[in-house]
């Protein structure tokens, strides 16, 4: 399947397929290979300035870090995402959502629910930059 995808797809499609493979690896507990793939995918999107995908894959990586209790790495990751969004001039609402997330990480109060809510929000905010972030009460 991967060979066919590489043959028929463009570079972004191939990287998105790798991202999917990373999610599957994470689900199967192959955390080392998942982390390496998430980082590779993230670097690809950073190089091309595809900010929302950088944030999404970073949140996947953040979930992995949280699951492993790697809070220092999660803190650095959130700082990097926020800096990228500020540098790219991403909408105020998305930046405000990321600041809230960063504060939760810094206070070590972040949850899987908050990461999930932020991922859903960023996906929706991509086409509606004025959409406010409202985390669920279970986050």
Show where each model-derived region lies.
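C-terminal non-catalytic interaction modules
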Residues: 40, 47-139
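Alpha-helical adaptor scaffolds
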Residues: 12-54
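Eukaryotic all-alpha helical interaction scaffolds
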Residues: 2-6, 25, 38, 45, ...
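Alpha-helical scaffold segments of alpha-solenoid architecture
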Residues: 1-7, 12-24, 101-109
